UniProtKB/Swiss-Prot annotation:
SUPFAM superfamilies: SGNH hydrolase
Organism: Mus musculus (Mouse)
Name of the protein in its database record: PC-esterase domain-containing protein 1B
Gene: Pced1b
Region: Disordered, residue numbers: 386-433
Family recorded in the similarity comment: Belongs to the PC-esterase family.
PANTHER family: PC-ESTERASE DOMAIN-CONTAINING PROTEIN 1B (PTHR14469:SF1), SARCOMA ANTIGEN NY-SAR-23 (PTHR14469)
InterPro entries found in the cross-reference section: SGNH_hydro_sf (IPR036514)
Lineage start: Eukaryota, Metazoa, Chordata, Craniata, Vertebrata
Amino acid sequence: MVRLLASEVQQLLHNKFVVVLGDSVHRAVYKDLVLLLQKDCLLTNKQLRTKGELSFEKDQLKMGGELDTLHNRTDYREVREFCSDHHLVRFYFLTRVYSEYMESVLEELQSGNHAPDVIIMNSCLWDVSRYGRNSLSSYKQNLENLFGRMDQVLPKSCLLVWNTAMPLGDKIKAAFLPQKCKGQYPRISVATLKRKVTQANLYSHAEATKHYFDVLDLNFHFRQARKHLQGDGVHWNEHAHRKLSYLLLAHMADAWGVELPQRDSWEPDFEAWESSGQVEERQPQDNLGPQVFAPSPHCPFRPPPLLPSPGLPIRPPPLLGCPLPQPQQMPPFPLYPQVSYFSSDPVFQSDEFYIHSDSPPPTHTGYAFEGDFSFYPQPPVPNFRPPCHQRQAPVVHRGFPRHFARGPYSNPWRDRPRRPPKHSPAGLESRPQ
């Protein structure tokens, strides 16, 4: 799994406008991105649980939250924004995938000074649990209306990533679930909610793919990571959200043709030495065994840039557990040349990473992470892949044949998939269900 430092995330999202739309799970997605743009540390449990605060890590509450009233009704609103010299990240809290409020959000994005470069979105749990017995059928219709409107409103350069809803625990105590009251529909059971979420994920994936939007299957990625669920069975801890951020950032980099640093997973468990909210600092440990990659005390650890600078050929040390070949003269492995991927154009140039052409659009193929995941700092390593190690990457779905660069000196930029123009009949408007 790709692991990035704050300095590398700042470069990747340089002059980018990122919009996050969703419920409280995606509020934590927004918070982790904002934190990772500034610090190499994880969210604290308090930061994950707090909602509607006036400020979080130098962001600003723009609407709702503590500026209004904190509650769990379907009309709850919360709009947050983090803005620096070269980064803009905004969050909109949603309780329904398409509604009059969502329409107002789309109009705001369309009329703003800066068009969004990335939209990260999911809405599912509220939709299938708070809107009556026919909530699933309404959800399907609203998804069709949403993606149709997205086709009309979003610029072709905008990358929309639809996230599937994450897995649920066996016991759900989330406060947003409806209670038995006043003769309305009864409280939904855990089994029924899980079944509805599965059906909603399948349908949203198909609908997003039909409209040529990207899908990141979070339900797949976290299906074996339930130990990172919070006690309410819905929300996730700081380690899960950092992995989620890495998945999203890797997806963006792949879409923009940016090559990220490759750090092989050889160190012990990340959680053994980093606690929530602790800035990443390399600490000595006695139980690590042979320090194959131990940094010299006179040479402090410095993370590599997104593309390694050219230098002397480096022969990588052998990995533990792999058979060592007999000593022999090895040809040098030249590193990639330094390429300027991140320009200093005016703030929020929405087409910074794109080259528009009429060539066939690219795609992603499916990948899989197996087992649990961990996080830890990585030393600089040469651009060399031992034959006994196989890297893995995010599960993404595009529906277009993927294009691979033919060499380290090839042009890495790739066209974004162009959505076919949608022509809606005059005078007809889709309305929220």
